């Protein structure tokens, strides 16, 4: 393979000069001689010089060092040997459990499946979380986004979904930690270990303290491992926490690569980078990838270019709201803002659809009446509106639920509620069967029977 020389180092971006007749291709991996450091070629600048991003810290790099062209993109181990292991962006183990003797390695840059290979699915994926199953149901092989500002519970929701689906679903999962807290990665590992599902999960981490090159590519590393499981004919779950940090890593290197920034300082290639990742997360005729992605919303502004670009790719959006978190209702899902393509009578059935829409109508009416209540008080409302308000407040509380992964903090055991029980409970509240129960009985319970039992103790 050809040898090049480092000619310039600016932060994470390194320029390497090669002989004119053997210039590396874009996306090829270069390896620093006598070191583990890997670079990925981003641009060819002419005169044999290529501009690269370092997949590791560039501390101590200097001009004149030699780098060799591997002749192929970054290759990572795939297959069953990756299960139960924690890896970095290059597929190297970071859990001190010995090498990963994978039979196969795949390049992290791949083409998305063609039109002929793709397959749609109408099958629902039950999560055991009432508000999600009722109002924004997930499709098997679909893409879901968890949107929320700082501290409204994206990661806790994500961990609960993983726990519920991984245990109930019994397939393989891949978790890509993109620019998140190392503590969360550690908690997550132990959570999986304690739930005895670690041997079904591959973990790929590029945490907050990593250089931008790692955070920019770690999502692709996780996705490549998921694609391998899918191409073996499995239904695989892909969790990405957090898509926003993927965009942010692109912002960090974009200016260093010499690109002009676009709106709000984002990279001009934002839509393309997002599309290249998202289009590969899809189901084929051999197997499916169901993906659940956490999306940080800067300053709670859903119109920011990063979350706005992500919206276009998703089948279901779960919006976590600060106003609902302030009421102490967790999961803090906004029932009026969250949407799903699956909420269609032809897919979920008429009964489920009607219940979900009536829940939303009741909550919407309550929202409209709030101003009147604030100024004139409840007594000025008509009897019909009073009923709507009391039922809406019960629905609001019944949408909360204790989580398994939060047991250590809350002290109350987690609850998994089947879709059948969820629909039955909300139908009962809407029909007025539980008008005599106090609001507090509906707060942080699983099924409606628990609410009835709780009312007796109040």
Swiss-Prot record:
- The disulfides recorded in the entry are none
Q: What NCBIfam families is this protein classified in?
A: atpD
- Record localization: Cell inner membrane
GO cellular component, alphabetical, reads: plasma membrane; proton-transporting ATP synthase complex
Q: According to the UniProt entry, what is the EC number of this protein?
A: 7.1.2.2
Q: What kind of membrane protein is this, topologically? A: Peripheral membrane protein
Entry annotated with the keyword Hydrolase? no
Full protein name: ATP synthase subunit beta
Q: Which UniProt keywords apply?
A: ATP synthesis, ATP-binding, Cell inner membrane, Cell membrane, CF(1), Hydrogen ion transport, Ion transport, Membrane, Nucleotide-binding, Translocase, Transport
What organism does this protein naturally occur in?
Legionella pneumophila subsp. pneumophila (strain Philadelphia 1 / ATCC 33152 / DSM 7513)
Q: What does this protein do?
A: Produces ATP from ADP in the presence of a proton gradient across the membrane. The catalytic sites are hosted primarily by the beta subunits.
Q: Which reaction does it catalyse?
A: ATP + H2O + 4 H(+)(in) = ADP + phosphate + 5 H(+)(out)
Residues holding ATP: 148-155
Q: Which gene encodes it?
A: atpD
Mind telling me which InterPro entries this protein's record contains?
AAA+_ATPase (IPR003593), ATP-synt_VA_C (IPR055190), ATP_synth_F1_bsu (IPR005722), ATPase_a/bsu_AS (IPR020003), ATPase_alpha/beta_chains (IPR050053), ATPase_F1/V1/A1_a/bsu_N (IPR004100), ATPase_F1/V1/A1_a/bsu_N_sf (IPR036121), ATPase_F1/V1/A1_a/bsu_nucl-bd (IPR000194)
